[in-house]
């Protein structure tokens, strides 16, 4: 689903979610840092990248865990923290701060009703030795791939086609088992991720890692880059990036001040169903699809 016709409203809504997130962090003394395209947007555009369609933040694991605990008993008004622990149909390991007055289903194959959101990625401690940290990242990735396989609802043809190639036989086996015990497998994989995520003490670690990130081994970097954060203007507010923002951004993106080619300036997120006006139930959505 293309959002070009509602881009202004979309951006205003997710910016409001970011402001609500920052207010929560300030009220409860939680650390956060903008990351990925949001960090580039802050440094290069002093706001959202014009063609970007989401907002991403990192939270050190101790603060992330505190946020999830706080969200169990605090009322955030029209916002809610959606996690793999409080929503059985939620297919991801990281969490989102969601506007509960909107409706969004991102993928037909992973049907989960949420709303417009800000992504909240836990930032975990990892080993001081880079090669050991890389091995742990590979283990994370393997577990996340299994979680994706378990939570994706394929058509019968897509399911059978996994038998056509030897390299997808393992995924076929996982999906076959998941058909009979999807919930149990999902919980087990999340438990495995939790165990790996809490293996190292964040306060004592030299290196950190975003286990759900998209930049492979670049997701491992020195914790000292984070510091207390550095303020940047962002639209009509201010946000925090890692204290060594330039070092952090160059590590991930090289010359981040240079615009990408025109053909790469596109939205990257899926939207199977969207209602900007209210939260709908499954029955209401099914009648429209």
What residue spans do the PLM features occupy?
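Active-site nucleotide-donor binding segment shared across nucleotidyl transfer reactions
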Residues: 22-55, 59-65, 224, 251-252
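Short, His- and charge-rich active-site/binding loops that engage polyanionic ligands
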Residues: 137-142
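A short secondary-structure junction signal
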Residues: 129-135
């Amino acid at each position: 689903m293309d959002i070009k016709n509602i881009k202004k409203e979309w951006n205003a809504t997710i910016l409001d979610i970011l402001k609500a997130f920052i207010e929560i962090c300030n009220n409860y003394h939680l650390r956060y840092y903008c990351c990925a395209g949001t960090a580039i947007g802050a440094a290069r555009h002093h706001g959202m990248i014009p063609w970007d369609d989401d907002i991403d933040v990192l939270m050190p694991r101790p603060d992330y865990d505190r946020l999830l605990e706080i969200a169990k008993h605090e009322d955030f008004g029209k916002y809610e923290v959606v996690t793999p622990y409080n929503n059985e149909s939620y297919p991801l390991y990281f969490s989102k701060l969601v506007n509960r007055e909107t409706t969004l289903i991102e993928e037909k194959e992973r049907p989960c009703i949420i709303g417009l959101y800000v992504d909240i990625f836990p930032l975990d401690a990892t080993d001081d030795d880079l090669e050991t940290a890389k091995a742990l990242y590979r283990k994370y990735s393997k577990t996340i791939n299994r979680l994706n396989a378990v939570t994706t609802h394929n058509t019968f043809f897509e399911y059978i086609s996994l038998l056509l190639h030897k390299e997808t036989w393992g995924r076929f086996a996982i999906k076959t088992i998941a058909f009979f015990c999807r919930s149990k497998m999902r919980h087990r994989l999340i438990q495995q991720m939790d165990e790996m995520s809490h293996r190292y003490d964040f306060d004592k670690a030299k290196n950190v890692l975003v286990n759900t990130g998209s930049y492979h081994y670049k997701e491992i970097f020195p914790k000292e880059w984070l510091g207390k954060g550095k303020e940047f203007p962002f639209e009509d507010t201010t946000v925090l990036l890692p204290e060594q923002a330039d070092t952090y951004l160059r590590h991930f993106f090289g010359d981040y001040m240079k615009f990408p080619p025109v053909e790469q300036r596109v939205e990257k997120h899926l939207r199977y169903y969207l209602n900007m006006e209210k939260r709908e139930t499954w029955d209401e959505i099914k009648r429209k699809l």
